[in-house]
């Protein structure tokens, strides 16, 4: 019962802008930050995701999964977080609009952890092969880009984090 989602190849813009535009046009109830290089290893991963609504019927939660990297399992990091439509509606965005590409997963993880709504599914494996040799990969992985996005992350945490936490907590109590 899934509807195909149209996509557009167009002007050069931040990936975050593109992801938000896609989410805003989609009737989906969950959104995942992941590219076309992902390999979904675990069978029925989609149903496992949907089953998390039983834990939080208000829909305010974030899902993280195993990626095949030991660091991620130890620290329960989620470079490919999954959020819900309710989460997006509460915050007003899919991913924080001020980010260009990197660090928005950290910010989202921080929010979910802060409100105690981070579900880490270590038995669900989604492996991603990082493509690092093409022109786009080289352009977005420079030291300057990393410093820019780290600065945006720190400023966003400083200026907006408590506000975003309050919006999510308010949505939890509805």
Locate predicted features:
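Acidic donor-binding segment of Leloir-type glycosyltransferases
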Residues: 1-10
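Active-site nucleotide-sugar/metal-binding loop of Leloir-type enzymes
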Residues: 19-30
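Conserved nucleotide-sugar donor-binding
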Residues: 28, 79-92
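Short beta-strand-to-loop acidic/aromatic patch adjacent to the donor-nucleotide binding site
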Residues: 28-39
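A short, conserved beta-strand element in the Rossmann-like catalytic core
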Residues: 38-41, 107
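Conserved donor-nucleotide/metal-binding helix-loop-beta segment in metal-dependent transferases, i.e.
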Residues: 43-62
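Short beta-strand-to-loop element that shapes/binds the nucleotide-sugar donor at the catalytic cleft/hinge
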Residues: 61-79
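C-terminal catalytic/acceptor-binding lobe
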Residues: 100-102, 106-174
């Amino acid at each position: 019962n899934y509807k195909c989602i149209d996509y557009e190849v167009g002007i050069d813009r931040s990936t975050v802008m593109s992801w938000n535009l896609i989410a805003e046009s989609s009737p989906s109830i969950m959104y995942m930050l992941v590219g076309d290089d992902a390999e979904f290893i675990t069978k029925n991963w989609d149903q496992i995701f949907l089953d998390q609504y039983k834990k939080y019927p208000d829909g305010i939660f974030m899902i993280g999964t195993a990626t095949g990297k030991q660091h991620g399992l130890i620290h329960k990091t989620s470079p490919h977080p999954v959020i819900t439509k309710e989460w997006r509606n509460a915050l007003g965005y899919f991913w924080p609009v001020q980010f260009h590409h990197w660090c928005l997963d950290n910010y989202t993880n921080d929010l979910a952890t802060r409100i105690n709504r981070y579900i880490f599914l270590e038995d669900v494996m989604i492996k991603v092969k990082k493509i690092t040799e093409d022109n786009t990969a080289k352009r977005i992985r420079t030291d300057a880009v990393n410093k820019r996005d780290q600065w945006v992350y720190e400023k966003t945490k400083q200026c907006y984090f408590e506000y975003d936490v309050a919006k999510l907590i308010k949505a939890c109590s509805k």
